[in-house]
Amino acid sequence: MHLQPSTAVVTGAASGIGFALSARLAQAGARVVMTDIAGDGLAGAVEELAAHGADVTAVVADLTDPAAVQELADTAFGRLGDIDVVCNNAGVVGPVGMPLWSVPLDEMHAVFDVNYWAHVHVARAFVPRLLDSGRPSHLVQTASMSAFVVGAGTASYAASKHADLAAARSLRADLDGTPVRVSVLCPGRVDTPMTRGLVAPRNATGNTTISADEAADAVWNALGSDRFYIFTNADAQTRLGDQFNDVWRHLAREKYWTESSSPSVNSSRP
């Protein structure tokens, strides 16, 4: 059953997928708290949506700071009352195109601070209150196809997205049997300010590009459902197949099963 949200919180909302999510939710009539560390960009985003009649509130916050995230939660619940949807969307690309041993450690830590730890802080601040409300709600974690598909030169970004996917899977198990649904958004290439100018990493396969609005529509269609993985790009099956078939081939070499009996990602079975 589709969840028709009346309230929502979106992180990383100043641009890209976060802005598109905020716009999609507001368009459907939801009151939205939009948060980002980029104060000027956030102010412009809120002004743009408000000019079209959206009920949106800006909260500038550094989500890598647990205390700031708790303050965000206090503000959001105080402004909105019960919250139906939390889009845990903040993210950065960080250094790409360098082998792991060449990436400055402080830059790698900075990527994890946003792509993993900020998501952990948001989940810890919001999920207990979502549970306390006893109402149906939905937590959407923005990961990436890089949570599955890894190319050369993506050590920081891909590893942080793997960690975020693991956290989302754990949250889904933790919240099983409760009114709180969990989904993980795994977009491929999306045309956003964060990704413009980037080239595909060496050894990467697939390069279809979608708009941020298309990613937001995919999230909207999943709200209230038990759909955990939200894949957005047309090449997702091919890219995942390339990765997982490689795993099956390695397992087959170790005699765990034969090539003929190994699972197939491209199987026509549901």
From Swiss-Prot:
GO MF annotation terms: oxidoreductase activity, acting on the CH-OH group of donors, NAD or NADP as acceptor
Superkingdom classification of source: Bacteria
Positions with a binding annotation for NAD(+): 12-36, 161
Chain sites annotated for binding substrate: 144
Gene3D superfamilies with a match to the protein in the record: NAD(P)-binding Rossmann-like Domain (3.40.50.720)
Alphabetical GO biological process terms: antibiotic biosynthetic process; lactone biosynthetic process
Catalytic reaction equation(s): 1-deoxy-11beta-hydroxypentalenate + NAD(+) = 1-deoxy-11-oxopentalenate + NADH + H(+)
Pathway listed: Antibiotic biosynthesis; neopentalenolactone biosynthesis
Active site, per annotation: 157
EC nos: 1.1.1.340
Keyword line: Antibiotic biosynthesis, NAD, Oxidoreductase
Activity dependence on pH, as recorded: Optimum pH is 8.0.
Other notes: S.avermitilis does not produce pentalenolactone itself in vivo but instead a group of new metabolites that are neopentalenolactone derivatives.
Function: Catalyzes the oxidation of 1-deoxy-11-beta-hydroxypentalenic acid to 1-deoxy-11-oxopentalenic acid in the biosynthesis of neopentalenolactone antibiotic.
Family label: Belongs to the short-chain dehydrogenases/reductases (SDR) family.
Name of the featured protein: 1-deoxy-11-beta-hydroxypentalenate dehydrogenase
Species of origin: Streptomyces avermitilis (strain ATCC 31267 / DSM 46492 / JCM 5070 / NBRC 14893 / NCIMB 12804 / NRRL 8165 / MA-4680)
Recorded name of the encoding gene: ptlF
